[in-house]
Structures are given as structure tokens and as C-alpha cells.
Amino acid sequence: MNPLIQSLTEGQLRSDVPNFRPGDTVRVHAKVVEGTRERIQIFEGVVISRKGQGISEMYTVRKISGGIGVERTFPIHTPRVDKIEVIRHGKVRRAKLYYLRALQGKAARIKEIRR
């Protein structure tokens, strides 16, 4: 990578990002702007994918809200996310958990591991 681009992106990286992987349940505190007000909206769900590297790394969180699956994708190093809390660590054998989209109820559960 170009040294100039690398030096610019190093200043943008966040240092408070916890260690989480697909299968983990996280609580994302996202800043939402409504008109002139800004508030924190909490989005809690299972991390189904993590892709990219460096400043452009992204992760997708899936939750069930009102019986409907909702997915949101966040950049890891964005200032729009106040904090990321890891609630529990899940035991999975895949890097991408897109198969959870087709499962419902107890079939969509992920076994918890203690780390």
C-alpha cells in the first residue's frame, strides 16, 4: 500500500474495538441523527459476517424484530458507532453465517462458548 495512504488511515483506526467473530452476540450503540438531535440507538444481534481489512473493515449484525429478520452492516472504525459490547461468544464453524437467514426459532440458535 502507498505509504501516504497508509499513514492517513492509521490515524482513522479506532483502538477501542473489542475482539469479536461471527457467531458472537453483540450490542452496537449507533449514533442516529434525527433533524437537529442526535441520540444513541442500540442494535443487538448475532454477527453473521465480517469482511474487509484496515479502515474499510465491515461487519453485519442480524436480529429478529417482531418476527422479521433485520440486518444492519456497520464499518468497524466509524465514528457513528459509539461502542460495541460483546454479550456472548458463539461456537460456529463458518466465517459467514448466511444460512441463519433461512432458519427460524430454536433452529437459529448458536451454542455459547466460554472465552
UniProtKB/Swiss-Prot annotation:
InterPro entries: Ribosomal_bL19, Ribosomal_bL19_CS, Ribosomal_bL19_sf, Translation_prot_SH3-like_sf. One of its GO terms (molecular function) is structural constituent of ribosome. It holds the Pfam family Ribosomal_L19. It comes from Streptococcus pyogenes serotype M49 (strain NZ131). One of its GO terms (cellular component) is cytosolic large ribosomal subunit. Belongs to the bacterial ribosomal protein bL19 family. Keywords: Ribonucleoprotein, Ribosomal protein. It comes from the Bacteria. GO terms for biological process: translation. This protein is located at the 30S-50S ribosomal subunit interface and may play a role in the structure and function of the aminoacyl-tRNA binding site. This is Large ribosomal subunit protein bL19.
